[in-house]
UniProtKB/Swiss-Prot annotation:
Gene3D superfamilies in alphabetical order: Ankyrin repeat-containing domain
Designated name of the protein: Serine/threonine-protein phosphatase 6 regulatory ankyrin repeat subunit B
InterPro entries: Ankyrin_rpt (IPR002110), Ankyrin_rpt-contain_sf (IPR036770)
Function: Putative regulatory subunit of protein phosphatase 6 (PP6) that may be involved in the recognition of phosphoprotein substrates.
Complex and partners: Protein phosphatase 6 (PP6) holoenzyme is proposed to be a heterotrimeric complex formed by the catalytic subunit, a SAPS domain-containing subunit (PP6R) and an ankyrin repeat-domain containing regulatory subunit (ARS).
Length: 990
């Protein structure tokens, strides 16, 4: 909030501050604006209310001042008057209808302000006008919270007397008691507890009032709560007790009090850390640690990750505390779960004094930690030369490798502190020692662009052209030093932009400096690794422009030589990774810009695919071809750019492309791909360049087919505006209308339909005779069906005899079927397809009972037979659809005596497929012996079939109904044949 100079304010404001009513009247009479706003949107009435001058407030209001005006923090004059504890001002404002429920930007009402500012009289005036004193602000705090936080005992008393909820909690579930305890207001704490406040209440993170008091060192509150008998070792959600919190915050007096009251000094939290761990690590925990150790705290207790209190002192360099722990029995070489001792940790963080304390106390400097590294490894890796010097003084085998074969010299080279390298070399470290991947310390120094380390190692005789297991030399690693990784660490936020740029430039210079030094010392840039990549490839891949320039100076033919040695040329690598400056260097010396990688892709293809517009521009300006196709998909750079919607790249390519409709292996044009992927800008640009909207791929699909299929609305609209053909058919005869109906795009379907029906040759059948109505019904798109049925053209079935009604019921789209019947005629329920099957057959085939009910309610013929003589019941029975069979037998009363062309009844068919439940449902309605023993064309009775398929319950039921066990089929087999469970045996059991 700005502080304004009074002399710069309007005369009316100055008069209010001077308290001169006569001058104010005169100014108002001279038409001074009583509602004028300052820079903070405060009015003269805000000023008067702040000053608490009731007479001037009255005068301003009577002169037209707005009583509920809000400043830019939404504070009203009433808020200001209450904050100033002016009882008279509050009374005047309320008399003139000031809003007692007005909220500022923090949702605080005048009562909140009164509670926070100890405006007791003001609160007494306001409260009778409120419906509740428990209104919360944006943080969920009530007036009681504010009074407790600020220690206003009388205000707390008043609020409680007026019905304040003593256990109301804010958005973090903190009660007024939490805030009073944290701030150390003993009288308020006692008052709240006496009025029934829950002394063991917890906030969302499990903190109790005891935790709150302990964290802020409120010793009197802690004593009071302990005297009330609260659980001293109560934990929050992290498992921390009040003792943990006190130690973490360095509250030694509270720690002493808690220990005296019997707090568990070895209580672990959820991660296994005790109060001693916290005291060892915290900034002000020295006295806390002394108290804990003197009261029996276990100095060697370990957390879940194996860290002892001594480890914690090592992390933060608390060497005095480490001495205390060691003197009290702290195990100096205890290891955490990674195998690190406190000495490893101290070396990692560079705490020389602590290292000295540990070594003096007998710490093992040759102890292996994480990955079998010495403390010296960690000190060297993190460039702590003083720590290295201290650790070297203890003496051990300096070239001992870790789990990856790396010596301390490898670590120092990676860390980049040349002093560490010199110390190790002077102690006899072998600079040609290799790790398990064949890398020397020089490889590590080069990979991290540590120039002085490289210089030192080379000067002392390191082999500059030594190759590792991948065939890479230090020169390869220097060329491949990763600037992008540094960028990722810094992030891409606006505030880091300048630092990012500086870091990038610095790393580029370092890489060039390292490369130049290596080249001057006879490093061979032509050496290829096992993948055929040389230094040029790596410099190009990682975008080191200066490195490439150095290499060009060294050997002008080197770039051309690099193009034929590996699957990808330097040009490809620079283009793919978007390094346009490196690319420009390469382009200066390369002849063939259209060289292909192993998949036939050019550098321009890769740059376009990745969206690197600057690289695309550089390649085009040097004459790279935009029409070269790869070997796999036969795509061009135009196709590559639209796949990911890289419109800037596409625009550059189209400026030099002769044909925007070039096709790939599937016959797809860039426009088709742009529409398919929904890249609106790319579609717009291609249409501007007059790309063909009616071109079809090898399957006959156009861009419009793709747009409708993928649902990209704006792309479709742009195509329609170009008068695209909407009746074009794909290889299966489907038009965009078919696709719209199949995908449920009713709006497009309506628009396309209007255009289609206005054309002379309007054929809307695909190669199988299916119309858009078939497709809409099959996929259950009611909105599309509604659109189609609005046209008389679709109010009669035509096309494939497997009608739209068949399509609807076979997929259980009951509403769609109902719409068809209502719009056309109920007679369609008995229409037949080429095999003589009705929609009832289709519904029975798919076991859709609701559709069966619908069809039969519109007089579908339940016993209609198809060309094979099968009824709907037979369909359901043969396919084992219990629901459909049950409905057709028991509700629809289907004829059970009907037979198909092979003389099978529905019972035969159910039994033949092993559908026992269906067979039993049918059998339950059969009493006639003629049906029980009915024979099909193979002379088989239901008993033959049931017995052969092992349907025991069906066999039992058939026998109970008198089925003949002596019936013989055409193979002279009786129903008790050897392949089945014996029907005769079943009869004997009965």
């Amino acid at each position: 909030m700005a502080v304004l100079k009074l002399a710069d304010q309007p005369p009316l404001v100055q008069a209010i501050f001077s308290g001169d009513p006569e001058e104010i009247r005169m100014l108002i009479y001279k038409t001074e604006d009583v509602n004028a706003l300052d820079a903070e949107k405060r009015t003269p009435l805000h000023v008067a209310s702040f000053l608490g001058d009731a007479d001037i407030i009255e005068l301003l209001i009577l002169s037209g001042a707005r009583v509920n005006a809000k400043d830019n923090m939404w504070l009203t004059p009433l808020h200001r008057a209450v904050a100033s504890r002016s009882e008279e001002a509050v009374q005047v404002l309320i008399k003139h209808s000031a809003d007692v429920n007005a909220r500022d930007k923090n949702w605080q009402t005048p009562l909140h302000v009164a509670a926070a500012n100890k405006a007791l009289k003001c609160a007494e005036i306001i409260i009778p006008m409120l419906s509740s004193v428990n209104v919360s602000d944006r943080g969920g705090r009530t007036a009681l919270h504010h009074a407790a936080l600020n220690g206003h005992v009388e205000m707390v008393n008043l609020l409680l007397a007026k019905g304040a909820n003593i256990n109301a909690f804010d958005k973090k579930d903190r009660r007024a008691l939490h805030w009073a305890a944290y701030m150390g207001h003993l009288e308020v704490v006692a008052l709240l507890i006496n009025h029934g406040a829950e002394v063991t209440c917890k906030d969302k993170k499990g903190y109790t009032p005891l935790h709150a008091a302990a964290s802020n060192g409120q010793i009197n509150i802690v004593k009071h709560l302990l005297n009330l008998g609260v659980e001293i070792d109560e934990m929050n959600i992290y498992g921390n007790t009040a003792l943990h919190i006190a130690c973490y915050n360095g509250q030694d007096s509270v720690v002493n009090e808690l220990i005296d009251y019997g707090a568990n000094v070895n209580q672990p939290n959820n991660n296994g850390f005790t109060p001693l761990h916290f005291a060892a690590a915290s900034t002000h925990g020295a006295l806390c640690l002394e108290l804990l150790v003197n009261n029996g705290a276990d100095v060697n207790i370990q957390s879940k990750d194996g860290k002892s209190p001594l480890h914690m002192t090592a992390v933060h360099g608390r060497f005095t505390r480490s001495q205390t722990l060691i003197q009290n029995g702290g195990e100096i070489d205890c290891v955490d779960k990674d195998g690190n001792t406190p000495l490893h940790v101290a070396a990692r963080y560079g705490h020389e004094l602590l290292i000295n304390t540990l070594i003096t106390s007998g710490a093992d400097t040759a102890k292996c930690g994480i990955h079998n590294m010495f403390p010296l490894h960690l000190a060297a890796l993190n460039a702590h030369s003083d720590c290295c010097r201290k650790l070297l003084s203890s003496g051990f085998e300096i070239d001992t490798p870790d789990s990856f074969g790396r010596t301390c010299l490898h670590a120092a080279a990676a860390g980049g502190n040349v002093e560490c390298i010199k110390l190790l070399q002077s102690s006899g470290a072998d600079f040609n020692k290799k790790d398990k991947r064949g890398r020397t310390p020089l490889h590590y120094a080069a990979a991290n662009c540590h120039f002085h380390c490289i210089e030192t190692l080379v000067t002392t005789g390191a082999n500059i052209n030594e190759t590792d297991d991948w065939g890479r030399t230090p020169l390869h690693y220097a060329a491949a030093s990763d600037m992008d990784r540094k960028k990722n660490i810094l992030g891409n936020s606006h505030e880091n932009a300048e630092e990012l740029e500086r870091t990038s430039e610095m790393k580029e210079k370092e890489a060039a400096l390292c490369l130049e030094f290596l080249l001057q010392n006879d490093a061979n840039p032509s050496i290829q690794d096992k993948e055929g990549y040389n230094t040029v490839h790596y410099a190009a891949a990682y975008g080191h422009r200066q490195c490439l320039e150095l290499l060009l100076e060294k050997n002008s033919n080197m770039f051309e030589e690099s193009d034929s040695s590996a699957t990808k040329s330097p040009l490809h690598l620079a283009a793919y990774n978007g390094h346009h400056q490196a690319l420009e260097v390469l382009l200066q010396s390369l002849v063939d810009l259209d060289i292909k990688d192993e998949k036939g892709r050019t550098a321009l293809d890769l740059a376009a695919f990745k969206g690197h517009a600057e690289c695309v521009e550089a390649l085009i300006s040097q004459g790279a071809s935009v029409t070269v196709k790869d070997n796999v998909t036969k795509r061009t750079p135009l196709h590559a750019s639209v796949i990911n919607g890289h419109t800037p790249c596409l625009r550059l390519l189209l400026e030099v492309a002769d044909n925007p409709d070039v096709t790939d292996a599937k016959g797809q044009t860039p426009l088709m791909l742009a529409v398919a992927y929904g890249h609106i800008d790319a579609v717009s640009l291609l249409l501007e360049k007059e790309a063909s909207v009616d071109a079809a791929d090898l399957l006959g699909c156009t861009a419009l087919h793709r747009g409708i299929m993928t649902g990209h609305e704006e792309c479709v609209q742009m195509l329609l505006e170009k008068e695209v053909s909407i009746l074009c058919k794909d290889a299966r005869g489907r038009t965009p209308l078919h696709f719209a109906a199949a995908r449920g795009h009713a709006t497009w379907l309506s628009e396309l339909l209007q255009i289609a029906l206005s054309e002379e040759d309007c054929s809307l059948k695909d190669n199988q005779g299916y119309t858009p109505l078939h497709w809409a019904c099959y996929n259950g798109h009611e909105n599309c069906i509604e659109v189609l049925l609005e046209q008389k053209f679709f109010r009669k079935f035509y096309g494939n005899s497997f009608s739209p009604l068949h399509c609807a019921v076979i997929n259980d789209h009951e509403n769609c079927a109902s719409m068809l019947i209502g719009a056309i005629d109920a007679s369609i329920v008995n229409c037949k397809d080429d095999k003589g099957r009705t929609p009832l057959h289709a519904a029975a085939f798919a076991d859709h009972v609701e559709c069966l009910q619908l069809l039969l309610s519109h007089s579908a013929q339940v016993n209609a037979v198809d060309h094979a003589g099968k009824t709907a019941l037979m369909m359901a029975a043969q396919n084992g659809h219990v629901g459909a069979v049950d409905f057709l037998v028991n509700i629809a009363k289907a004829d059970l005596t009907l037979r198909d062309k092979d003389s099978n009844t529905s019972l035969h068919l159910a039994s033949s497929k092993g559908h026992e439940k269906c067979a039993l449902l049918i059998l339950d309605k059969i009493q006639e012996q003629s049906l029980i023993n009915a024979k099909n064309n193979s002379l088989q009775t239901p008993l033959h079939i049931a017995a052969r398929n092992g349907l025991k319950m069906v066999v039992e039921e058939l026998l109970a109904k008198g089925a003949c066990v002596l019936a013989v089929d055409e193979n002279v087999s009786r129903s008790n044949g050897p392949r089945t469970s014996s029907a005769t045996d079943v009869q004997k059991e009965e």
